[in-house]
């Protein structure tokens, strides 16, 4: 929970869940068709989804003095985006622009469980590794190939798995 959503009421009566006039209300999708009355990640009510295309939310995250700006100026080296492949490419590009605005040396890493170089999601080819999005991804296919080899799987299998992600 957070002061922005405030489902549990830990932050008084404000927040999008408790106050229909909250400035954060438009960040979320409230509808009785959803479990709990709002859209949440994979139906987990403790993980309300935000609308990454909402202009005020985008500004809150990427704008001057926003989340990205604040943490990087306080010394963070960069950010890791959880389930980056479920974020819109435009939003990732805006996050990257905010990161690089602070310093070109700051880093944006994405969690993508599959081969990110060939990733299709929601009916389209993902573009986050084409220069305007992520600096890198967590390479789980490579990690799995190496671990399988170390655990005794045939070297040829590891080689084929690694070559499948080398394009």
What are these model-derived regions, one by one?
Residues 44-60, 76-86, 146-153:
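The substrate-binding groove and active-site-proximal loops of carbohydrate-active enzymes
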Residues 28, 35-39, 49, 70-73, ...:
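A generic structural signal for ordered alpha-helices
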Residues 6-14, 67-68, 72, 96-167:
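Conserved alpha/beta catalytic core and glycan-binding cleft of carbohydrate-active enzymes
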